Regions:
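Ligand-binding loop in jelly-roll beta-barrel domains
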Residues: 53, 89, 109-135
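Tight coil/turn sites that cap or link beta-strands
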Residues: 65-67, 101-102, 110, 120
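Short acidic-glycine-tyrosine-enriched beta hairpin
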Residues: 87, 94-112
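Short, conserved beta-strand element in jelly-roll/cupin
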Residues: 59-66, 74-92, 128-131
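A short, N-terminal "cap"/entry segment at the start of jelly-roll beta-barrel domains
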Residues: 2-56, 154-182
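A contiguous, mid-protein "functional segment" used to position or interact
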Residues: 121-169
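Short histidine-centered beta-strand/loop micro-motifs
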Residues: 48-49, 69-75, 116-118
Length: 182
């Protein structure tokens, strides 16, 4: 008789068998090999990609400076935010809520939303998108930065207009719609 637990699946289980091609992934947020992306003032570090999770979700470490955050948008996937540091003001279908460190927000697919750091301190969020793909959009429209806390370069008016045009053009490929400010 074995003293360990039986790690094989039961023959009548409805759960698929283990896929030995997939491995445990340990990600360290300060790993210099992770992609650090600057997006109009915010810095996003992809901790887990769709490739890591068989497309099920991605995990992004977001550093949002005072005044930062994305414009109104919506997308055809679920998105959750865990506030790790600071606080953000989230607008969901036109209603504003404040989420502070230790709190979680969940945005259902297709719902218009945005978030904004109205405080005078840095905010840090962990963002989960399911299924994955948003991390690819960020990589296409953003600019690489050195670390997860490196601020992206400041954009002049022309560069910001070019960024917005590029984001608007690529958004549909990533099941995202950028909305007008109310």
């Amino acid at each position: 008789m074995s003293s360990g637990s039986d790690a094989t699946s039961h023959p009548s289980s409805s759960i698929p068998p283990d896929d030995p091609r997939r491995n445990l992934i340990l990600t360290r947020s300060d790993d210099p090999n992770l992609p650090h992306i600057g997006l109009v003032g915010d810095t996003y570090t992809t901790l887990l990609t769709g490739k890591d999770t068989a497309g099920r979700f991605c995990l992004i470490d977001m550093h949002i400076p005072p005044g930062g955050g994305p414009p109104p948008h919506r997308h055809d996937f679920e998105e959750s935010f865990i506030v790790v540091e600071g606080e953000i003001e989230a607008t969901f279908r036109g209603v504003k809520s404040v989420a502070a460190a230790g709190e979680t927000l969940h945005v259902p697919a297709n719902a218009p939303h945005q978030f904004h750091n109205k405080s005078d301190r840095q905010a840090r969020l962990l963002c989960i998108c399911s299924p994955a793909g948003q991390e690819e959009f960020f990589a296409k429209v953003g600019v690489p930065v050195a670390t997860r806390t490196t601020a992206p370069p400041k954009l002049d008016e022309k560069a910001e207009a070019e960024f917005r045009a590029k984001a608007q053009a690529l958004a549909p490929q990533y099941k995202t719609e950028l909305l007008r400010q109310a």
